[in-house]
Amino acid sequence: NSIFMRLSGYARGALVGRAHNVVRHPDMPAGLYRCVWDDITAGDAVSAYITNRSSDGGRYRVFATIVPSGAGFLSVRTLPMRTDLRDAVEAVYARVRQVETASDAAGASRREAAAAGQAALLEELQALGYRDSVDFTRRTLPDEVAALVAAGVGIPARDGDGPLARVLAEMNGVEVATADLVALLDECSRMVALLGRRSDEIGSLSARLKRLRDCLREAFADVERYGEVDGLILECVEQLHPLAGQVAELRSDVDSVRFGIALLRLHNLASGFFALQIIDGEDELDANDAVGSLRELTRALRDGAERLTERLALYHARGELVGGELDDVAEALTAIDRPLLDLLGSVPDAGADDEAAVSSVRLARSLVRDGFPEARHLADLAGAVRDLEVPYAAADIDARLVLVEAALAELA
């Protein structure tokens, strides 16, 4: 489109039908493109900070998001907003390029050098706190979209008649319908962080309860004396065993919802701005299949809307399940507190014949000195999971996309 031509410095005829290599900058590592290709061919969306080369040998930076679309792929590029992260990633690229250059010098083939670069890039991403390139996309796209919205980027309105005007009006309508969704990006981010902390806390709590059971067995020779308390602790341990994994899965669900919201808004913005460029005469309707491009953007928007519906259904189902489990564990922990303190208080601190037993009791007391604050944490988490409401007007968005598709059919 006109923006791509302006940034790259190429005329339309010099770009149509050409491979992306025409704007590839030598600073970009081959390992990145290998990661991109692996991810999109696996059906995943990909986001990356990319530096392109313009026709005069200069450079321009973009934040690219690529998704599978039909038999091919759809790429949307925006101005990088997280400049701190962009700079950190560009430093990573420079180090990865050094690995690839060293591989070249050692006689590696281009494919082998790219593989070495890909491995180095994935290690670098892990050092930045990302599991892999898919995790980078899942977390970075929402941040970039949230920053765009915070900067006031939105689809301008235009008065007018005709199919393109209707496309723009409906894309404005989708933007309005998803405004509350976009406002949830930060809330979802906080929920993801909270679920991560609680998942770690559950693991630590489980280990503490197991150690507590060991202490009771070492302190009391008579099983009947501690058996009731031990049974309560065992019940908690068994409830906690699957819960850490369930909370981690719920965290992934929230992450997925957050990503789905961001992708929906990205394709909404791209569709609206492309329609606007044609209306304003910046792009020609018949040039480079503009209608086909709008149709593909609309299809991506519809696919994203449908996937978000699926993501939300999964989150709500798992949230209800995990919320109930969290409540159960919180109640079980609260039920342990008094009987456990009574049991430990029945053993004198000194004077007993069995010093080993006294030592075990002291250790047990240290393990429960502050009680089980995790009970409150887990109960609060259950409430937070249930209280996360996602105002998604799926039917309204679908109806607007039907009108967009009808308008595009008139232009075909």
PLM feature segments, named:
Residues 1-99, 174, 181, 188, ...:
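Sensory/regulatory domains in signal-transduction proteins
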Residues 70-153:
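Sensory coupling linkers of modular signal transduction proteins
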Residues 107-114, 118, 130, 160, ...:
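Intrinsic-disorder-associated interaction segments
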Residues 123-234, 238:
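Charged heptad-repeat coiled-coil "rod" segments that mediate homo-/hetero-oligomerization
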